[in-house]
């Protein structure tokens, strides 16, 4: 008779191998196929159902980069990851800076996630701050940096980023808040959307706080300093994958 621990270990290995294979297939498939949903969307939907909130629905509408305004692409880079074109998924200078700042200040720790890390985390992983999830996030980040172009990473990020309660992706956010497609977003509208990205449940696009409005103006200045639309073209971020 098989030892129950051996039986459990056998199935745990089976599950782990299956998950790894699924991740590999997903990385390859999503390098060219539209992403239908992210793990964050699934997690939010299940959480709503468990809370008996059946009115909640995760909305997302995939669009290719050719249907996304350069303004929003530049805005999220200016707001979230200005070294995005140069790094291989990790901004070690930002990580070091955040570690020093967190050591000197009490309270909630701040992160230093790049756009690549946020894409890997939101697309493939559950929410949380465990070392296991961080390790998996690092591996998935390296995988998409290796297998996808920077343009593709940015396109996927813009399609799965959360901009409000049940609002995922720039197309859905643009329609919901501004009643237009993502291709028609102005610089000011794009900066406002990017301003809530750190915490779209705390910061609101439709009722922005003074902090959000200040952040919007800061993002607009950073967009100009980066060079506007020419920055995207110069760094090969305008290719429609």
UniProtKB/Swiss-Prot annotation:
Q: Which reaction does it catalyse?
A: [GlcNAc-(1->4)-Mur2Ac(oyl-L-Ala-gamma-D-Glu-L-Lys-D-Ala-D-Ala)](n)-di-trans,octa-cis-undecaprenyl diphosphate + beta-D-GlcNAc-(1->4)-Mur2Ac(oyl-L-Ala-gamma-D-Glu-L-Lys-D-Ala-D-Ala)-di-trans,octa-cis-undecaprenyl diphosphate = [GlcNAc-(1->4)-Mur2Ac(oyl-L-Ala-gamma-D-Glu-L-Lys-D-Ala-D-Ala)](n+1)-di-trans,octa-cis-undecaprenyl diphosphate + di-trans,octa-cis-undecaprenyl diphosphate + H(+)
Q: Which controlled-vocabulary keywords does the entry list?
A: Cell inner membrane, Cell membrane, Cell shape, Cell wall biogenesis/degradation, Glycosyltransferase, Membrane, Peptidoglycan synthesis, Transferase, Transmembrane, Transmembrane helix
Show the Gene3D superfamilies listed in the entry.
Biosynthetic peptidoglycan transglycosylase-like
Main subcellular location of this protein, as a coarse class: membrane
The pathway entry for this protein reads as: Cell wall biogenesis; peptidoglycan biosynthesis
Q: Where are the transmembrane segments?
A: 15-35
Q: Where in the cell is it found?
A: Cell inner membrane
Q: What is this protein called?
A: Biosynthetic peptidoglycan transglycosylase
Source species, please?
Answer: Photorhabdus laumondii subsp. laumondii (strain DSM 15139 / CIP 105565 / TT01)
Which gene is this protein's source?
mtgA
């Amino acid at each position: 008779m098989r030892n129950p621990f051996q039986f459990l270990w056998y199935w745990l290995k089976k599950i782990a191998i299956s998950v790894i294979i699924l991740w590999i297939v997903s990385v390859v498939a999503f390098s060219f196929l539209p992403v239908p949903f992210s793990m964050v969307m699934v997690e939010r939907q299940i959480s709503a159902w468990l809370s008996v909130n059946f009115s909640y629905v995760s909305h997302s509408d995939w669009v290719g980069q050719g249907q996304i305004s350069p303004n929003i692409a530049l805005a999220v880079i200016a707001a979230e990851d200005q070294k995005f074109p140069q790094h291989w998924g990790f901004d070690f200078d930002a990580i070091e800076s955040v570690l020093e700042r967190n050591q000197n200040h009490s309270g909630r720790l701040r992160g230093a996630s790049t756009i690549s890390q946020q894409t890997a985390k939101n697309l493939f992983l559950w929410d949380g701050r465990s070392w296991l999830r961080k390790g998996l996030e690092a591996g998935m980040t390296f995988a998409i940096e290796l297998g996808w172009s920077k343009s593709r990473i940015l396109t996927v990020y813009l399609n799965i980023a959360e901009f409000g309660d049940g609002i995922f992706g720039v197309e859905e956010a643009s329609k919901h808040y501004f009643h237009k497609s993502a291709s028609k977003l102005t610089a000011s509208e794009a900066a406002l959307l990017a301003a809530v990205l750190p915490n779209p449940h705390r910061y609101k696009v439709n009722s922005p706080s003074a902090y959000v409005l200040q952040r919007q103006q800061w993002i607009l200045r950073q967009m100009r300093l980066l060079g506007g639309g020419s920055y995207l073209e110069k760094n090969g971020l305008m290719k429609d994958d």
